[in-house]
UniProtKB/Swiss-Prot annotation:
HAMAP family: eIF_6 (MF_00032). GO terms for biological process: cytosolic ribosome assembly. Belongs to the eIF-6 family. InterPro entries: eIF6 (IPR002769). Binds to the 50S ribosomal subunit and prevents its association with the 30S ribosomal subunit to form the 70S initiation complex. SMART domains: eIF6. The lineage of its organism: Archaea, Methanobacteriati, Methanobacteriota, Stenosarchaea group, Methanomicrobia. This is Translation initiation factor 6. Gene3D superfamilies: L-arginine/glycine Amidinotransferase, Chain A (3.75.10.10).
């Protein structure tokens, strides 16, 4: 199932929300009708909470079927809601916007090159994936420069051949380049996707949507 939805009048659904195959995390003040559409489209349960008292959930956290990595500033009451759906680990240090720093699915994670060995070990243990440092399109904020499901990966259009090869080797999935919202290269900022459904903002064009569908495995060959 594929839908185009905006949050708060903006197309950046990947900044205001985060999801795994099982659950989508949404701000408490999002209209219930929108929440219902998101859950139906992605085929997930819903957790409604802020992260670090912020609606920028997609920037502050990431996760997969095994657990969640969140900002070190995440409140206990916020983490407790997530813990009903998996282990929660706080990212320690100065860089805590986990959603910006980590691109993950159920088998692998690419992370910001400056993340510490200790943080990488924590990510490996919580998400139960192989972790590698890297960039996408020269950007260290790989979480916003890409979108990964268990079927495929879409990344920044300026990703180099070397970066694409690293991603394909790490995730063992097809990788393609594309844009969202009429030319934005930060594809992770405007996509929420599982293997069952896909949401992007209303500014994403038809050709962009076709590329997204193809990259994330929604078009059968």
């Amino acid at each position: 199932m594929i839908r185009q939805i905006d949050f708060y009048g903006y197309p950046y659904v990947g900044i205001y929300a985060a999801n795994t195959e099982q659950v989508v995390v949404l701000p408490p003040d999002l209209p219930q009708a929108t929440v219902d559409l998101v859950a139906e489209t992605l085929g997930t349960a819903v957790v409604r909470t802020l992260i670090n008292e912020s609606t920028l959930i997609g920037s502050m956290m990431t996760g997969n079927s095994n657990g969640f990595i969140v900002s070190d500033l995440t409140l206990d009451r916020e983490a407790n809601l997530l813990q009903e759906h998996g282990k929660v680990t706080r990212l320690k240090g100065k860089m805590t916007a986990a959603g910006n720093l980590i691109l993950a699915n159920d088998t692998a994670a690419l992370v910001h090159p400056a993340l510490t060995d200790k943080n990488i070990e924590a990510i490996e243990k919580t998400l139960k994936v192989e972790v590698r440092r890297g960039t996408i399109g020269g950007l260290k904020t790989v979480g916003m420069a890409g979108c990964a499901t268990n079927k495929g990966i879409l990344v920044h259009p300026r990703a180099t051949e070397e970066e694409l090869t690293v991603l394909e080797d790490l995730f063992k999935l097809p990788v393609d380049i594309g844009t969202v919202s009429f030319g934005s290269p930060l594809v992770g900022s405007a996509i929420l996707a599982t293997t069952k459904g896909l949401i992007t903002g209303t500014r994403t064009s038809g050709p962009e949507l076709g590329r997204i569908e193809d990259a994330l495995g929604f078009i059968e060959e």
